[in-house]
Amino acid sequence: MKTKLIVLNYAVHALCTVFALLQFSVAADISAAAFILCAAFIAFLTIISSAVFTLKKVKNYPIVYKLYQYVPFVLLAGFIMRRAGGTALPYVQDVISVLLWLAASIVSVTMLYHLNPKRVFVQNPDFARAAAEAGLISAKNELLPKKRRGGAKFIFEALDWIDAIVQAVCTVVLINIFIFQLYVIPSESMVSEFLIGDRVIGFKTASGPKFPVSDVGLPVLRSYKRGDIVIFRNPRYPQDNKSEVKTFISQMVLMFTFTKVNLNVDESGEIKADPLVKRVAGIPGEQLVMQDGV
């Protein structure tokens, strides 16, 4: 194997290990599971990838390739689980964890680029020879499909579908957090600009989106003036860690069920009007006067 792949592999393991250590907790709640999840994933990735890159078990290459696809998602799950408990973490620890997540995600994506079946066997002849001897690839360096029958075929096809859905949902969640998100107008407050049920897209990147369940985020790159349409969290509802985790989970469930199940409800069981889509009426430094409720 080329040195580049070996270095990238070690880099991912090192970044993930430090990240996992920062999620360690002795509290008797869900936060304790964060370290266990990250550590178990890293240990499994290390064992499988070491066997593949030393050419001892080349047949496990598809597993390694799949595991690297899940690095950002597993670490994100660990980050959220650690903050779902009752113990608050220092802001500095959140910053370091986010930076480690970002670095591990970038390196893992780079690793996936080099591990792509269209490149890895062409760029690594020794790996290609070992894969051919193991019956993993053809003479044209193309992966050979495994022949499965009966129940095994059904199970693996079902797992492929589940894998595709999970990765799609996790990718959409990341896009919704940092780039843009689709919202539905719940009330008449924006008539005649928007009607009830209208869908609007809110672009987040320039507005300083926050990492889930933390105050760490991108810098705010834009300012707002009177008349701008803005999207913001409803201050009526609590925004502590427990509530933020519930909101995040409800978004995941909403996507996995194709918008059929919405768990984002208040104490009375009503769906939350959160976030809100409003028009800016006043800017910092101005005074507003209410007359006859207007």
Question: Which residues make up each language-model segment?
Answer:
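Protein maturation boundaries and topogenic segments
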Residues: 1-275
